[in-house]
Amino acid sequence: MIYLLDTDVVAELTTRARPDPRVTARFRSTAGLNRFLSVITVAEIEAGVAATPDPVRQARYARALAAVRHEYHDRIASIGGPEAAAYLAIHKTLKAAGAGIDPPDALIAATALADGWTAATRNIKHMARTGVLVINPWEEKL
């Protein structure tokens, strides 16, 4: 199974002093080559680093971001034609149902859908509505 890690998962694994053991166990049991990030996730992390007012924390987060960029340098999925088409389908479906989703979440879900991947997120409520296969590493058992 190939996982597209949502921003909350990356933050848990890289910035917490003691990441949740369920999350670390889930991804220790998964080959690194089967874990991807969306360019949207990277952008959300960059925005979070830039918005951190405490310079010490900002520096720590910037180091974590640099490590993530290094580790995933060849596994950062961009948004192309198939992802854009999946995004449009998600947007139309949810709009017709009277439900909304933040564009970053919809783009991450669209990337997973277009590539046949599983989205790993704590944000099950919003992601599941998109039709993407979703796991919550905080709840899933190995």
Identify the residue ranges that each predicted region occupies.
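Acidic, PIN/NYN-like endoribonuclease modules and their adjacent C-terminal/linker elements
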Residues: 1-2, 109, 113-142
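Active-site neighborhoods of divalent-metal-dependent phosphate/nucleic-acid chemistry enzymes
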Residues: 47-58, 74-122
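A conserved hydrophobic position in a structured secondary element of the catalytic/binding core
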Residues: 5, 37-40, 79, 122
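A generic structural signal for short hydrophobic patches within well-formed alpha-helices
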Residues: 10, 42-45, 84, 127
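Short, well-structured N-terminal submotif of metal-dependent ribonuclease cores
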Residues: 1-38, 50-67, 141-142
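General small-molecule cofactor/ligand-binding pocket signal
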Residues: 36, 77, 135
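Short, flexible helix/strand-to-coil boundary loops that buttress conserved ligand/catalytic motifs
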Residues: 14-17, 49, 91, 130-131, ...
